[in-house]
Amino acid sequence: MTRKERYTFILDYFGKKMPVVTTELNFGNAFQLLVATMLSAQCTDARVNMVTPALFARYPNAAEMAKAEVEEVLEYVKSVSYPNAKAKHLVEMAQMLTDAYGGEMPDSMDELTKLPGVGRKTANVMLAVWFEKPAMAVDTHVFRVSHRLGLVSDSDNTPQKVETTLMKNIPPSLASRAHHWLLLHGRYVCKSQKPKCDECEIKAVCKHPNPKS
């Protein structure tokens, strides 16, 4: 099977399996999506969704959070991973978003990554989910599944290299959905530890069947 055939097979499978797919994070506007995505770094979406209702009720937009003290925001996010750093970044992000962008979410990689606490992966989530632009956010699940399914080479050993290879081979119209397909497959089937290979419907093309990790 050529790489092109591999991509076609896998994308066709997911397109039929999950024709409609999006993030599992809960949000009501662009600011809230950015906050939830920042909180989700090295933390489960389920945990983030437990803390954001109260957080968003108190700080529904950037202008409100920009006025907050870090300690105040920390009280709402203390159950997520790295709460101190994340609370600090959230307040600083809200302040910059308010002061430099008038509360409007920037829609480019360069501008998004100027915001405190916003890296390439988070920016790609915003571009794909909120702005519906062709973008590929590579988290630990996407990275792992891409390698196991042979979508990328062993030399693609960084998230950005994986992103580049995926974007070269996935049609722009499918890029944002493909991110969610790979992520959800990694989250629920192709897990890091004890992957559910017996439940995997595309194991025939897996390059690492029954991996130990």
Name what the model sees in each region.
Residues 2-213:
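Catalytic cores of DNA base-excision repair glycosylases
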